[in-house]
Amino acid sequence: ALPLDGDQPADQPAERMQDISPELNPLFHPVKRGCCSPWNCIQLRACPCCPN
C-alpha cells in the first residue's frame, strides 16, 4: 500500500466536507457541522452566525 501523503481527498476529511453541498449531505446540521465557516456562510446565508 502507498503511504498516505495527505494529497488524497480521503486524507483531508475537513476539506472533503466542503466538496459536498450541505443540502445533499445527510450528515449536515447547521449548528453541529460548522455553519459558521466562511464556506457555509457563502452557501447558506441564512445561518444565524453568518454576517448578513
Swiss-Prot record:
> Where expressed (tissues)?
Expressed by the venom duct.
As stated in the Swiss-Prot or TrEMBL entry, residues carrying the post-translational modification Asparagine amide are N52
Which GO cellular component terms are attached? extracellular region
Which residues are propeptide? 2-33
Q: Which family does it belong to?
A: Belongs to the conotoxin M superfamily.
The protein depicted here goes by the name Conotoxin reg3h
**Cysteines paired by S-S bonds:** C35-C49, C36-C47, C41-C50
Signal peptide, first to last residue: 1
Location in or out of the cell: Secreted
Write out the domain note.
The cysteine framework is III (CC-C-C-CC).
- Primary location group: secreted
Domain of life, per lineage: Eukaryota
Q: Which residues carry this modification: 4-hydroxyproline?
A: P38, P48, P51
Q: What GO terms are given for molecular function?
A: toxin activity
* Keywords tagged on the record: Amidation, Cleavage on pair of basic residues, Disulfide bond, Hydroxylation, Secreted, Signal, Toxin
